[in-house]
A protein has these predicted regions:
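Short helices/loops that flank or line small-molecule/ion binding pockets
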Residues: 26-37, 54-55, 83-84, 165-174, ...
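Structural recognition of the beta-strand scaffold that forms the well-ordered cores
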Residues: 18-21, 39-42, 60-62, 69-72, ...
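Alpha-helical secondary-structure segments
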Residues: 14-16, 34, 66-111, 138, ...
Length: 298
């Protein structure tokens, strides 16, 4: 990208910026260490960050962003169309231990589909504390037999792989046998997100304030609830901040009750950059990488 000399507003400091698309985090870390990359916002593999500890020209800055990791359940398929099964799966997973495993406990266990950096985030009580016995009771009441087999698909990114492996172990303890299905991004986007052809999947939604996806008829996890629809329509129709906030909290509570997906955790955002770079976003409210205020400091 080159600076536009005819831009009407404040001119950016940098003359040009080159974006490099590097899907392999290890290769990206090598490029950062070699000085071939100057910055990597939202570095995806936390276990690699230690490589930068002794790099004098680099710094790692931890910030916030609307990261919401979920175990998405296909509400249009049996047995996930039964709320008791979805709640049982939530009880079967120790989400605090999960957060500890994937991020050394740095983050927040989620109770609904909203990240802590959202102004409307509601710190709801934990409706589904780790309780394998309660999970077995709910599965039995829903007619789910021990040994029931399901498939858990996940895209090629570290948190999804690690989380999926741990969830498979937790569900096996309550009688659900999980087959792990790793997918490359094109296959995941086509089969899971596009066609809704899956049982369960681990994915992080990083769009800000995207709770409205639960009111979409075409959403990949096939959740439909008239009560949530009514709340969202009232939210959309209101312009009063207090009313919208109250309705947002109600929507979060409704999702926590229905548990269309198992809400797992939100973790911070790590940005790796040259120590002389200034002005790059480290906290991210929206999915953007503004460059107008970025500059090199001595």
């Amino acid at each position: 990208l080159a600076r536009n000399p005819n831009y009407w507003g404040k001119p950016p400091v940098l003359k040009s910026v080159t974006f490099r698309f590097m899907p392999d985090p290890l290769a990206a870390s090598n490029a950062l260490l070699a000085g071939e990359l100057d910055a990597y916002p939202s570095f995806p593999e936390r276990e690699i960050l230690g490589r930068f500890a002794d790099a004098p020209e680099l710094r790692v800055i931890r910030g916030s962003f609307p990261f919401k990791a979920i175990l998405a359940l296909n509400n249009g398929r049996r047995p996930f169309n039964d709320v008791r099964v979805r709640q049982a799966i939530a009880y079967a997973i120790d989400r605090k231990a999960l957060l500890q495993a994937v991020s050394d406990g740095d983050g927040t266990v989620l109770q609904s589909h909203m990240a802590p950096n959202d102004p409307d985030y509601a710190p709801l009580p934990d409706r589904y504390p780790y309780n394998p016995e309660r999970a077995r009771e709910l599965l039995k009441s829903a007619g789910v037999q021990p040994g029931t087999q399901v498939r858990l698909s996940f895209p090629p990114i570290g948190y999804a792989r690690d989380t999926s492996e741990l969830i498979a172990a937790y569900l096996e303890q309550v009688g659900i046998i999980v087959t792990l299905q790793p997918l490359e991004w094109p296959a995941w986007l086509s089969r899971v997100f596009g066609q809704g052809a899956f049982d369960m999947t681990v994915i992080a939604h990083t769009e800000p304030h995207d709770i409205g996806i639960y009111d979409r008829d075409t959403i990949y996890f096939h959740y439909h609830n008239p009560a949530f629809h009514d709340l969202f329509q009232r939210y959309e129709a209101s312009s009063a901040p207090a009313t919208r906030h109250a309705l947002s909290v109600s929507m979060q509570s409704q999702l926590a009750q229905d548990e269309p997906n198992v809400f797992l955790y939100s973790v911070p955002r790590d940005t790796v950059m040259n120590r002389h770079i200034r002005g790059l976003w480290t906290d991210q409210q929206i999915a953007a990488c503004p460059l107008a205020d970025v500059y090199w400091a001595p």
